[in-house]
Amino acid sequence: MDPSTKLCMGCMNELGSDCRCHYCSYTDDIPHLQAYLAPRTVLDNRYIVGKMLSYNGEGASYICYDMVGKCKCVAREYMPDTLCERDSESQRLVVNPDCLAKYKTFMSEFADVNKVLSRMRNLQHIATAKDMFCENNTTYVILE
């Protein structure tokens, strides 16, 4: 059985026996923005993506569940929507050919910033990056 069927995609708490969330009332029929990842997408064969929490010009943040660590976390996706778009079938980002150099430069900066943040584990008020990987022609950072 798919482990995501037991989890609410709004808060990543276990669903009740009636398959409803008694914590946040999220339902699977809530639409998501097509340019971003759909709930129940699995990243790196490890992280179940839930609803999108926020997005800006740099990317999007999603609540997610770590199937290995068995904990909730946040996935941050590099997705500058003015430079690329998502292929709806493959989930890969397709970069506008005129923007390829800019896309790669900004993605490198995104990765560099998150590498620095991952070394700041001792600071209480900074979300710690616990994992970073490339998939779908972009970079993802998992925050604790």
Annotate each language-model stretch with its function:
Residues 8-11, 21-24:
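Short cysteine-rich clusters marking metal-coordination/redox-active sites
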Residues 15, 23-35:
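Short Cys/His-rich micro-motifs in 6-15 aa windows
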Residues 30-49:
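A short, low-complexity linker immediately N-terminal to eukaryotic Hanks-type protein kinase catalytic domains
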Residues 50-56, 61:
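Protein kinase glycine-rich loop
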Residues 54, 121-125:
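Flexible N-lobe loop architecture of eukaryotic-like protein kinase catalytic domains
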Residues 67-111, 115:
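ATP-binding glycine-rich loop module of kinase domains
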Residues 128-139:
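Short beta-strand micro-motifs within the conserved protein kinase catalytic domain, predominantly
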Residues 141-144:
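Short pocket-lining segment of the protein kinase catalytic domain that shapes the ATP-binding cleft
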